């Protein structure tokens, strides 16, 4: 044991990031062995040829099929493509079994979505070296559930997540801080975990094209361009990440809100709506940072005479983006503001849940122009009508209608 202990750092942590490969497709294959080795896609209504590819097997990817591709196009590339409709009940059960297996190795597990999670194995040296533990986890998932995964091994969450993306399927990658200059820095900033297309564009605007340039960039210029989040990204580009694996994290987030007390009473609607938009942006950032979504938006209006009005809107579908939160909040505002001057304004997202894979699929569609003109729910209805995929809408609702939700089940078992 003492020899094995020497394979762990004297200071610092050992973090694993377990990421299931093509999760939905892999679950389908595990439950129907005849699909093994064949091009498979999980998508919408095959008969009407209106589906969108949610995920596909690696065999399908060899034909050029990708997530978000229209089903008709995928069929053109691969006429023999096998299509399955999404089965969220099946996927949730497989996810629960996955986390049960992970819990054999450590109690320090942080699920971040239906198909991925972090483990802190710093104190698990009695089980073997970090690489041996990763191999045992990978083999257990493959043998017992027939589900492949990739695992990243690193000293912090960011590097572990980055490492797990490097080898798929069935990869195990060790990423140390000393590996960063060679393995991470040459990549474009858009390839870095946590940087989306818009953030990458902003960084490009200040002549930051690579992760190395981000790591070595001027902190003040980066902060001025994208705020405090930019400084956090710069630290991670240097390999620094102080976040802990927190098994109780989800239980702490019953709501996410922000409010602002004004130095003087305000009655200009434009200024108040501008503040409402800024508060919505702040709530959105906090939700996305924690991979959460909301099914209820609430506003608080405190008037100059201390009267307080709190109103909320129940939503049919999960939201997390700034524009959707602001849309719900501004509607409430227009319905309930009586015209008097305001001293405090607040926006809160409640009924918080994980941004599970079924909810994430709504990210896959680009209906930005429609979203500017139509309510979010109308856009989602349009997606369902056009692509024949009502499960994208109802799947997220199904997660919430269980007597004991998937999230609660995980929390009660592992947290």
From Swiss-Prot:
SUPFAM superfamilies: DNA/RNA polymerases (SSF56672), Lesion bypass DNA polymerase (Y-family), little finger domain (SSF100879). Its main location: cytoplasm. The active site is at 116. It catalyses: DNA(n) + a 2'-deoxyribonucleoside 5'-triphosphate = DNA(n+1) + diphosphate. The keyword Ribonucleoprotein does not apply. One of its GO terms (biological process) is error-prone translesion synthesis. PROSITE patterns: UMUC. The keyword Transferase applies. It is an enzyme of class 2 (transferase). Its cofactor is Mg(2+). One of its GO terms (cellular component) is cytosol. One of its GO terms (molecular function) is magnesium ion binding. It is found in: Cytoplasm. InterPro entries: DNA/RNA_pol_sf, DNA_pol_Y-fam_lit_finger_sf, DNA_pol_Y-fam_little_finger, DNA_polymerase-Y, DNApol_IV, PolY_HhH_motif, Rev_trsase/Diguanyl_cyclase, UmuC. CDD domains: PolY_Pol_IV_kappa. Keywords: Cytoplasm, DNA damage, DNA repair, DNA replication, DNA-binding, DNA-directed DNA polymerase, Magnesium, Metal-binding, Mutator protein, Nucleotidyltransferase, Transferase. Gene3D superfamilies: 3.30.70.270, 3.40.1170.60, 5' to 3' exonuclease, C-terminal subdomain, DNA polymerase, Y-family, little finger domain. Monomer. Belongs to the DNA polymerase type-Y family. This is DNA polymerase IV. It comes from Bacillus cereus (strain ZK / E33L).
């Amino acid at each position: 044991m003492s020899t094995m202990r020497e394979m762990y750092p004297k200071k610092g942590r050992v973090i694993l990031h377990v990421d299931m490969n093509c999760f939905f497709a892999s679950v389908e294959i595990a439950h129907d062995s005849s699909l093994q080795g064949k091009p498979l896609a999980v998508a919408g209504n095959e008969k009407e040829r209106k589906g969108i590819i949610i995920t596909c097997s690696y065999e399908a990817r060899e034909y050029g099929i990708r997530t978000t591709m229209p089903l008709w196009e995928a069929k053109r590339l691969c006429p023999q493509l096998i299509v399955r409709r999404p089965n969220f009940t099946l996927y949730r059960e497989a996810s629960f079994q996955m986390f049960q297996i992970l819990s054999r190795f450590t109690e320090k597990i942080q699920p971040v979505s239906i198909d991925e999670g972090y483990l802190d194995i710093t104190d698990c040296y009695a089980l073997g070296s970090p690489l041996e533990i990763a191999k045992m986890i990978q083999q257990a998932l493959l043998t017992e559930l027939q589900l492949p995964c990739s695992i990243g091994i690193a000293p912090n969450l960011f590097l572990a997540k980055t490492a797990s993306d490097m080898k798929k399927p069935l990869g195990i990658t060790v990423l140390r801080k000393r590996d960063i200059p060679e393995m991470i820095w040459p990549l474009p900033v858009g390839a870095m975990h946590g940087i989306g297309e818009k953030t990458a564009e902003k960084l490009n605007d200040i002549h930051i094209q690579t992760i190395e340039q981000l790591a070595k960039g001027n902190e003040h210029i980066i902060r001025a361009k994208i705020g405090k989040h930019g400084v956090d990204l710069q630290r991670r580009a240097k390999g620094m990440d102080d976040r802990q694996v927190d098994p109780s994290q989800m239980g702490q987030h019953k709501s996410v809100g922000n409010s602002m007390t004004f130095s003087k009473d305000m009655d200009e609607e434009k200024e108040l709506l501008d503040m409402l938009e800024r508060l919505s942006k702040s709530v959105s950032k906090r939700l996305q940072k924690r991979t959460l979504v909301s099914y209820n938006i609430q506003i608080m209006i405190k008037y100059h005479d201390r009267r307080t009005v709190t109103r909320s809107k129940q939503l049919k579908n999960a939201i997390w983006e700034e524009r959707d939160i602001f849309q719900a909040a501004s509607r409430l505002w227009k319905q309930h503001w009586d015209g008097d001057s305001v001293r405090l304004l607040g926006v809160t997202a409640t009924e918080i849940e994980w941004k599970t894979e079924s909810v994430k699929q709504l990210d896959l569609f680009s209906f930005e122009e429609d979203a500017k003109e139509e309510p979010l729910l109308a856009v989602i209805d349009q997606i369902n009508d056009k692509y024949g995929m009502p499960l994208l809408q109802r799947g997220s609702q199904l997660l919430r209608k269980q007597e004991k939700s998937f999230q609660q089940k995980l929390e009660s078992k592992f947290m």
